Amino acid sequence: MALQQYNKFPFFFSGILGPTRLNGLQMPPIQTMVRWGHQYAPRSIRNQKAQKGRVPIPIGGSLRGTQLEWGEYGMRLKDRSIRFHAKQLETAEQILKRILKPIKAARVYTRFCCNVPVCVKGNETRMGKGKGAFEYWAARIPIGRVLFEIGGDGMRKELAEHALKQAAFHLPGKYEIIVKQTPKRLGTTLIHETPITTETSKMNYQEITSTTTAV
């Protein structure tokens, strides 16, 4: 009976779960309009809270995300793995866009995903009684990953390096400016890819046999 009475009014909003009506017009659910209040927030997430966790280290030898994909210049983390605040990354992106604004064809590419919800409890709070409320989004970036790429027609090398240095100045950690020809990075080691030939294969076989006989 209550729902039938409410449906008589054209200005009735049925809530978050169902569609809304305004003067007889169907509107999408309210949940699809909310994006967690930040541009880096994921579009869909399974759990609203997560454990603190640790930044993964590529101990298996993965080189994914250590080279440029779309841009001509990039900024790569080289000293340690860091959990970044979404606002820190947003500030760095705004700096890049502001410096590269005079170049019409300039573009900024992001290579990270802020999919870690961080929850915070108030100061001087007793132990227990839940994890705490959602505070901000974060991203776990392991060592050797590319964070930003920039590219475009007419971009000079000096301007690109200046923009990336200014963005790195506002982020924690140490970074290196890379180009397309920069070798991949595994932790703190640069991986130089050499073509495999008969001579290199023989040299590797001799090194392996010498080490096994010495043991």
UniProtKB/Swiss-Prot annotation:
UniProt superkingdom: Eukaryota
Keyword Ribonucleoprotein assigned: yes
Stored Gene3D superfamilies: Ribosomal protein L10e/L16
Pfam families, per the entry: Ribosomal_L16 (PF00252)
Xref: InterPro entries: Ribosomal_uL16, Ribosomal_uL16_bact-type, Ribosomal_uL16_CS, Ribosomal_uL16_dom, Ribosomal_uL16_sf
UniProt-annotated location(s): Mitochondrion
Recorded GO CC terms: cytoplasm; mitochondrial large ribosomal subunit
Keyword Nucleotide-binding part of the UniProt annotation: no
GO molecular-function term, one example from the UniProt record: rRNA binding
Alphabetical keyword list: Mitochondrion, Ribonucleoprotein, Ribosomal protein, Transit peptide
Main location: mitochondrion
Function text: Component of the mitochondrial ribosome (mitoribosome), a dedicated translation machinery responsible for the synthesis of mitochondrial genome-encoded proteins, including at least some of the essential transmembrane subunits of the mitochondrial respiratory chain. The mitoribosomes are attached to the mitochondrial inner membrane and translation products are cotranslationally integrated into the membrane.
Self-association state and partner proteins as the record states: Component of the mitochondrial large ribosomal subunit (mt-LSU). Mature yeast 74S mitochondrial ribosomes consist of a small (37S) and a large (54S) subunit. The 37S small subunit contains a 15S ribosomal RNA (15S mt-rRNA) and at least 32 different proteins. The 54S large subunit contains a 21S rRNA (21S mt-rRNA) and at least 45 different proteins.
Descriptive protein name: Large ribosomal subunit protein uL16m
